[in-house]
Each structure stands twice: as C-alpha cells, then as structure tokens.
C-alpha cells in the first residue's frame, strides 16, 4: 500500500484548527505542542480531508472526555498537596486570587517544607478553604468592614483551615470584623491589589499591611499588572481546565530535577520533636547587611497605599521565633529595622509581632505545641490566634 500526498482542502484546514484546540487542553510546553501539531499536519496531508477531520474530531472528543473524567473522579485534586495551589487563579485587576465562590475541604498530608525537602516531618490536618466572589478567603463578600488585611500567604493562611485565619480570630474572639485580601506576592502585588480594591469599594476602609520577613523584602518597582491580550485571555480558558492543570503538573514533576530542593530543609529537634526550617529564610534571618531604601523603595510603596493604610505588622520567620532553642548568638534584625525606618518616613505606624509569637512559643512548648507548623514555613492556628490578639489590641487604637 502506497501513501500519496493529498491536496489541502477546506476539511484539512478545519482538521488543523480543531486539532490545535484539542492540543491546547494539554499543559505541555509550547515546543512539544507545536511538534505534535506539525506531525499531525503531515499525517493529515496523506490521510485526506475527510479522514483528517474525523481524526481531529476524535482527538478533541478524547480530550474533552479526559477533562471530564479528571474533574469528576477528583484526579485533579490528587496532584496537589494543599488547596493553596489547587485553587490558585488569576484576575486582570487583582492579579493572583483563589477560585471565586468556592468551598473546598482537603486532607493536607504535609507542609511546603516537606514538599520541597522531603525531610520526613509531616503534620497532616484537614484544611478548609472558602472564598468570596472576588476570590479571597472570606465567608462572605465585603460588606463595609472597617479594616482590610493585606499581605502574602501568611495573611491568607496558606496552610491553615478557614476557622484559623486572622480574620476569623479577630471576628469571633475580638468582635472586629475584617476583610482578608491576602494572597502570595510582594510589595508590588500588595499595592496593585489594594488599588484594585479601592476601585471597587472606594476609600472608606483602613488597610492593615502584613510584611513577612522571609520573602517580602524585595524591591518595590511600581510594577503594574499587565493586561492580557485577546490571545492570552483565550488561552487562559484552556489553562483553567482540569486536563490542562493535571497534565501540566505531571509534566513539571517529570521534568523536576531529582534532589533539587533537598538541601533547602534544615531539620532541628525542638521540644522533643523534629522541626523543619527553610534554609533560605534562615539566611534571611541571619542577614547582617543593612537594607537600604535606595534599593528596596518601600517608602513610595507605603505612600501609594495612602490614604487607606493605617497600620503595618511585621511577621517574623519561624527560625527567628525558635532561635532561642537553636542559636546561642543574638540574631541581627535588619528586616525589622529597615521596615521601621521606612514606615517612619512614610508616617505609618508599624508593629513587630515577634515578641508575642516568641512568648507563645515558650508557653506552648512544654505542652508539645508550636506556633508554626513543624513541616511548613507558615504559622499554624496557635500562631494566628496569638497574633490576632495582638493585632486586635493594636487595631483598637485606630477605631473611633
């Protein structure tokens, strides 16, 4: 049997178009998708228009069926170890958000440090996420709360269940109803997110900004959110499907270098139990280089948050909180000192949460409890509870 090259027809071009849409449902690199598409185009030339269109339709139907199966069976959830990544999405105004109007319960088997470093320390727990219509972790939409909490994954409560969030402790224990605008990012993201919130709700709220010692001290550049073009918005429809997310995760796992993050985990024994620390955050905590305003530019960032910004809170790394059991030498405090200086220049009050977290760590240790997850970089329910008490005390001074 000999193969003969067929002249391209309308059916051939339709087959190419349909097959390209089917391939976009797979989260593979562009180079791989293009290679497969070129191979299909070559095969279609020999198959003829009708056969090519039938094959393309079969590929599209198969992709749609796979997408349904992955969604219906929960396979997509199985590739994520916590809701933080599973529910992550993007918004043209706010940037990173969670999937809006979603409630999800997941058995989180381990934290981010165990995921990165495989240190053998695991604290499994149930994690419930509930999001509002904007895609932030609130039980209801914004309804005029006086305070809006802005910050990264610690403010958002990345590894914690909904009832343990700062906003929940503040509302239930201290009768201060606040709104959670937290999501992983840096100072650029906090400014953009706050401005987007102002566009929606005006200036009749006060911003409490949470700055994390571990990864928030990067330069503020005034970077705005790039507005996606028509092609990017179209491709985002594919990226939101279960099949794309599932295959993308499988690809990343297969291409991940073995042992790439194994050196990131520092395991120490505290209170008779193993606790893991992120070496990068340990290095940040031990930094003795003076941080300069002409490098980080936090002052214009704080100015950009006016007139809403009312208070800044400094969140220490887990290593700083537990340093008294690990290091015999006093730690430097360059991040706090810089933030204090920048806040003073911007005329915004700032408060350090380190002392209350350290005191609670001392109090809880004899009971075998901690204020940060032993397998994660984030604080746990104990940490957010004691932090909320201090936050409530400070915010009360800003209430009429």
What does each model-found stretch correspond to?
Residues 176-187:
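A short beta-strand-loop structural module common to alpha/beta enzyme folds
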Residues 185-196:
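Structural motif
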Residues 3-8, 371-400:
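Histidine-centered active-site loop/cap adjacent to the catalytic His
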Residues 156-158, 187-189, 216-221, 319-324, ...:
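Short catalytic/ligand-binding loop motif for oxyanion handling, primarily in non-cytosolic enzymes
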Residues 1-146, 204, 217-222, 226-227:
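N-terminal secretory targeting modules
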Residues 74-176, 192, 256-291, 296-303, ...:
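Membrane/wall-proximal cationic-aromatic binding patches
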Residues 52-58, 65, 318-354:
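Substrate-gating cap/lid alpha-helix
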Residues 16-20, 215-307, 314-337:
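Serine-dependent acyl-ester chemistry module
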């Amino acid at each position: 049997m000999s193969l003969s090259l067929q002249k391209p027809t309308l059916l051939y071009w339709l087959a190419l178009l349909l097959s390209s849409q089917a391939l976009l449902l797979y989260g593979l690199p562009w180079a791989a998708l293009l290679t497969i598409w070129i191979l299909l185009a070559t095969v279609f030339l020999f198959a003829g228009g009708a056969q090519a269109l039938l094959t393309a339709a079969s590929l599209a139907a198969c992709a749609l069926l796979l997408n349904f199966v992955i969604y219906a069976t929960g396979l997509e959830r199985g590739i994520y170890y916590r809701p933080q990544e599973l529910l992550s999405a993007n918004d043209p105004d706010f940037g990173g958000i969670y999937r809006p109007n979603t409630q999800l319960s997941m058995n989180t088997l381990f934290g981010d440090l165990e995921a990165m470093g495989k240190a053998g320390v695991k604290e499994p727990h149930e994690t419930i996420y509930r999001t509002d219509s904007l895609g932030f972790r609130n039980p209801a939409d914004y309804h005029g709360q006086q305070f809006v909490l802005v910050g990264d994954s610690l403010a958002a409560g990345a590894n914690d269940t909904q009832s343990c969030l700062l906003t929940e402790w503040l509302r239930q224990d201290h009768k201060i109803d606040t709104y959670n605008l937290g999501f992983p990012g840096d100072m650029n993201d906090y400014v953009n997110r706050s401005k987007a919130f102002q566009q929606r709700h005006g200036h009749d709220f006060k911003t409490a900004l949470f700055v994390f010692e571990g990864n928030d001290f990067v330069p503020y550049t005034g970077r705005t959110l790039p507005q996606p073009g028509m092609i990017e918005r179209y491709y985002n429809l594919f990226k939101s499907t279960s099949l794309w997310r599932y295959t993308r995760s499988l690809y990343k796992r297969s291409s991940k270098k073995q042992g790439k993050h194994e050196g990131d985990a520092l395991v120490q024994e505290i209170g008779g139990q193993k606790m893991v620390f992120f070496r990068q955050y340990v290095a940040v905590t031990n930094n003795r280089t003076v941080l300069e305003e002409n490098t980080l530019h936090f002052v214009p960032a704080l100015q950009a948050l006016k007139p809403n910004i009312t208070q800044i809170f400094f969140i220490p790394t887990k290593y700083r909180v537990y340093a008294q059991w690990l290091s015999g030498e006093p730690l430097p405090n360059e991040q706090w000192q810089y933030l204090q200086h920048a806040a003073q220049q911007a005329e915004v009050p700032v408060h350090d949460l380190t002392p209350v977290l350290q005191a609670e760590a001392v109090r809880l240790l004899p009971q075998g409890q901690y204020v940060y997850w032993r397998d994660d970089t984030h604080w746990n329910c104990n940490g957010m509870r004691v932090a909320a008490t201090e936050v409530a005390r400070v915010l009360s001074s800003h209430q009429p």
